[in-house]
Amino acid sequence: MENLEFIEEVLEQEHKYSEILPVSDESVYETYEFCDEQCLEDCTISAVQEFYEADLHRIPPYEEASVEQRAQYLTEFHDNFSMQTGYANNLHFVNDMNPRDYGAFNPYTKRIDINANLLKDDDTQEIMNTIMHESRHAYQHFAVEHPELVSVDMETIRIWEDNFNHYIRPEFDYEEYQNQPVEADANDFAERMYNEGLCNVA
């Protein structure tokens, strides 16, 4: 699928969902400063660690919190590393998403939409991994659009750009969808950041 078609498909869904929290008055912020990949990893690992350490003292803790409180906790988690992806203030929890869809990054609006149903699960791993996965897609797109502002090598950026231009949708071939470069990279990023952050929890 060509990138334009992919963007059009995303835009068709843009107004379909209702927010679980009021939309921030602030628009998505895009940085034009250098976004180092190692710094992104370090900040994300620290964000995972700090999320779990904070929950030891938080009132109420995540398991006892309302859906709205959980969304706020996870927004703060995302805020701790999102600027390193190239964007900030772009996380939204939305209702009415297809139950099979956990989240999505919109390359046109730069929004990250997360399925609000994930907030009902007391276990945070799935929703945190989804936030990190979609944040990695944000970084991939930022790298393609601003190669001079990232530490990613040009060959990798070329591969990502080509993949976005010929993106494989999961409904067409799920195995190929999972194995394509941008999805394999986002899955690896989310898994590594979560595991390393969890290992650092005091």
Predicted regions and their residues:
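A conserved beta-strand element that flanks and buttresses the S-adenosyl-L-methionine
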Residues: 131
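Catalytic Zn2+-binding segment of zinc metalloproteases
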Residues: 134-152
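Metalloprotease/metallohydrolase-associated module, dominated by Zn2+-dependent proteases
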Residues: 87-89, 148-202
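Acidic-residue sensor for enzyme active/binding pockets
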Residues: 14, 30, 134, 140, ...
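Short coil/turn segments at secondary-structure junctions
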Residues: 61, 65, 118, 122, ...
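Hydrophobic (often cysteine-bearing) scaffold residues that line and stabilize catalytic clefts
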Residues: 66-74, 124, 128, 178, ...
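Auxiliary, metal-adjacent structural segments of Zn-dependent hydrolase domains
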Residues: 2, 7-110
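Active-site scaffold of zinc-dependent metalloenzymes
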Residues: 94-125, 138-141
